[in-house]
């Protein structure tokens, strides 16, 4: 990688990370990966223009979308909103045992034409199709880096052997392994699971060897403070922020949660105090 490429990567990463080195990124790939039923709690958010307009107005640092959603709603982004385009995905229409592969659904040059600041792809470490996703990621990373664009790996350990040996995919040992694998395959940013404690997540951050690690937001919590506490622990563990979908778009008014997350991530505010300040409790 020459100096021009590395400068391009660093500059584009700053589209997501503030001066504190942290980011709050809104995830909008659920309609494809989980299906439109994910939007049933607040049905108007099935319209990407509506929800993206809301989250951008509330102040998220970046938005992650699939290429088609960018075409539908990309003009809702502000000039300073980071755009992450994900180039792999899968549906939940296939049998569960066949959902251990994310296929490539676009190319780096397509994402760049759409205005991407970063390119993302998923690898299910431990899947029987791990080698396919590893090759996809390697090709995406090589091409993106050649053009000076950062790559983000959604490093998700999952597969029958993981379940058999560790009991769950969130076991810190496999999450740590996935984060290290992401770093060693060239990721500039890593999105991964919560491991259940600040102490174990700190080991995940250490294993990533300096590559920023962001929390995968997961399912919506009934109590917003519970989620804010997890994000607080991620930050305390040295994590670089969170990529959040359902804990935002499954709320009638997502703005208070976004602003509370900003308080926790960027201002180091106590989760309960942040929730009170934004009227969540």
From Swiss-Prot:
Q: What is its EC number?
A: 4.1.2.13
Catalytic residue positions: 191 (schiff-base intermediate with dihydroxyacetone-p)
Extract the Gene3D superfamilies matched here: Aldolase class I
What is the predominant subcellular site recorded for this chain? Answer: cytoplasm
Enzyme type, top EC level: lyase
Matches recorded under InterPro entries: Aldolase_TIM, DeoC/FbaB/LacD_aldolase, DeoC/FbaB_aldolase, FBA_class_1, FbaB-like
Q: How is its activity regulated?
A: Activated by citrate.
Q: Name one GO cellular component term.
A: cytoplasm
Domain of life, source organism: Archaea
* GO annotation terms (biological process): glycolytic process
Molecular function GO labels: acyltransferase activity, transferring groups other than amino-acyl groups; fructose-bisphosphate aldolase activity
Q: Which CDD domains match?
A: DhnA (cd00958)
Q: Which reaction does it catalyse?
A: beta-D-fructose 1,6-bisphosphate = D-glyceraldehyde 3-phosphate + dihydroxyacetone phosphate
Annotated signal peptide: none
Disulfide bond positions: none
Keyword set, alphabetical order: Chromosome, Cytoplasm, Glycolysis, Lyase, Schiff base
Coiled-coil annotation reads none
User: Which compartment or compartments is the protein found in?
Assistant: Cytoplasm; Chromosome
Family affiliation = Belongs to the DeoC/FbaB aldolase family.
Query: How is the quaternary structure described?
Result: Homooctamer.
Task: Please report the name of this protein according to its UniProt entry.
Answer: Fructose-bisphosphate aldolase class 1
Q: Which species does this protein come from?
A: Thermococcus kodakarensis (strain ATCC BAA-918 / JCM 12380 / KOD1)
């Amino acid at each position: 990688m020459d100096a021009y490429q590395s400068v391009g990567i660093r500059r584009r990463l700053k589209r997501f990370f503030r001066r504190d080195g942290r980011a709050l990124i809104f995830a909008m790939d659920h309609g494809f990966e989980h299906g439109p039923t994910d939007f049933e709690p607040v049905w108007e958010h099935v319209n990407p223009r509506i929800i993206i307009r809301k989250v951008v107005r509330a102040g998220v640092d970046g938005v992650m979308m699939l290429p088609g959603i960018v075409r539908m709603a990309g003009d809702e982004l502000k000039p300073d909103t980071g755009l992450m385009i994900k180039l792999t995905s899968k549906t939940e229409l296939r049998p569960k045992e066949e959902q251990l592969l994310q296929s490539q659904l676009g190319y780096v040059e397509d994402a760049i034409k759409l205005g991407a600041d970063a390119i993302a792809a998923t690898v299910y470490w431990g899947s029987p199709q791990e080698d396919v996703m590893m090759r996809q990621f390697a090709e995406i990373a090589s091409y993106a880096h050649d053009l000076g664009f950062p790559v983000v790996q959604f490093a998700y350990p999952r597969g029958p052997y993981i379940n058999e040996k560790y009991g769950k995919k969130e076991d810190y040992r496999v999450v740590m392994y996935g984060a290290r694998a992401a770093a060693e395959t060239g990721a500039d940013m890593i999105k991964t699971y919560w491991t259940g404690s600040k102490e174990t997540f700190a080991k995940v951050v250490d294993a990533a060897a300096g590559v920023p690690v962001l929390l995968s937001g997961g399912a919506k919590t009934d109590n917003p403070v519970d989620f804010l506490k997890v994000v607080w622990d991620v930050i305390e563990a040295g994590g670089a922020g969170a990529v959040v979908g359902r804990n935002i778009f499954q709320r009638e008014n997502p703005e208070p949660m976004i602003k509370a997350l900003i308080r926790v991530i960027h201002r180091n505010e106590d989760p309960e105090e942040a929730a009170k300040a934004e009227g969540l409790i």
